[in-house]
Amino acid sequence: MERSPFPHSGPLEADEVTGRDDEAADLVRLLGGRVPVALVAPRRYGKTSLLRRAVWLLDQVEPTSTIWLDLYGLSSVSDFAVRLDRALSRTTGRFREHLDRIAGGLSLNIGIVSAELRRSARSGPDPTATVHALMDSLGRTTEHHPTVLVIDEVADAVGVGNVLEIARSHLQSVYRDMGLAFAGSKPTMMTRLFADTDQPFYSQARRMELEALPVDAIVEVVHRGFASTGRHAGPVAAAIASFGAGHPQRSMELADGAWWLTEPGTGADQATWEAALEAVRVRSAPALRDFFGVLSGTKQAVLRAVVRTGAPFAASEGRFHDLSNSSITIARDALVDEGHLRTGGGTTSLVDPLLADWIARELP
């Protein structure tokens, strides 16, 4: 059975990432040069996929071990210890052998920290001491093996115990021995993390914004995907690029929908595009409705105003929703920080084109 050339569910494999060659090259240069990077972009914008490609490319030049530490929804120091242990337990080869020897000398067994921490408070290990031991083991191992540490959704660790302080205390001595990438989807929090003097990682990483995909990149990806499977994209490629507004995941979701409606040896047309768009609309509507429904009334009003007028401060919208400028400002800033709105060049727009489309069609 044929497989769609437009995967869009979850992070992509390194060889599936397209349209980000320049960004991948920049990351390879920085990580290979041991320059810490803070990669910022909305969720589902391809941060993890891009980092996978970058470390894969780096590995072609210099065999490198990569540790992936995901801090999304981090809740406690114990939670951090478990996630770090899980990330380290996925390593293999000589890196893992060296890591196990060092950890063993600290009476630490990589891979079973979760079970140990879930024992009773009296018999279980101290979470903070465990994090110190894990970070020490990692740092000492990287002195002997080229390593990249990727910390995803790092902003979720802000205010969670002292995990960032502990991490900083161990990483500062091995900055020149490892590539270090911080990734996050909350722009304001990422700025605070690396720009506020009271934060442990103040001025410790070069910020890199992941922008929307250019129109020509999306058009090329769609045409190439169709052609690789004996199909012609026709006008669908341009329609996807226009509707998708540079959103990588949504653009590929639309391309996938159109591809399945196009038989091998044929070409897509306007009818294909309309059918694909309608199918994606129907499939995504329940999730969009649920997402919108849990927002505060003010946030809902701001999103509706942006869709209708391109600005959250339109006087007519403020009167219509009975909102003050101050409440609109607070809601807008929160939506920007959460990655749902983007601003720049005097304009404001929704990050998710399907959400914007749903609001425009469903709400007055």
What does each model-identified segment do?
Residues 33-36, 40-45, 49-147:
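P-loop NTPase nucleotide-binding core
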